[in-house]
Amino acid sequence: MRVLGLDVGDRTIGVAVSDPLGFTAQGITTVHRKSVKEDIDELKKICKEYAVELIISGLPKNMNGTVGEQGEKVIEFCELLKSELKMPIKMWDERLTTVAAHRAMLEANLSRAKRKKIVDKMAATYILQGYLDSI
C-alpha cells in the first residue's frame, strides 16, 4: 500500500510517497499553490500515478501541542482534499520537521538556493517517514 505524505503551506505543498511496501518515504515534488481547485487536481494526479491509498498530512502545532492558525488552514484544506479524493487522510504532528530538514541540508552543504527548492518535499519526507516508522 502506497502512502502519500504532505507538508501543506500557504505557498507550496511538499509531497513525498512511500515505497510500495510502506517502509521508506521519498520526496517527489513541491506543488506551487495556485488555487485550491488546481492544488487538489495536482494532488489527484499524483495519487493516481502512484496508486496511493492513504494520505498523511503534517499538522502544524504550537510547541505546547495546541493547533494554531496555520494548523486550522491545513485541516480545512485536508477536509476539502478528502471530500474530493474520497480517500482517508490522517493528520501527523509535524513539529520541527522543517527544522530537521534544514539541518540535514546544512550538514550536506547544500546552497541556500538548493535548500529553498527542496525544503518542502524534504519536510514531507520527514512527516511520512515518521508515520511509517510508527506503524
Swiss-Prot record:
Top-level enzyme category: hydrolase
GO biological process, one term: rRNA 5'-end processing
Cross-referenced Gene3D superfamilies: YqgF/RNase H-like domain (3.30.420.140)
GO cellular component, one term: cytosol
Subcellular location per the Swiss-Prot or TrEMBL entry: Cytoplasm
NCBIfam families, per database record: RNAse_H_YqgF (TIGR00250)
SUPFAM superfamilies reported for this sequence: Ribonuclease H-like
Protein name: Putative pre-16S rRNA nuclease
Source organism of the structure: Clostridium novyi (strain NT)
Classification via InterPro entries: RNaseH-like_sf, YqgF, YqgF/RNaseH-like_dom, YqgF/RNaseH-like_dom_sf
EC nos: 3.1.-.-
Molecular function terms, GO-annotated: nuclease activity
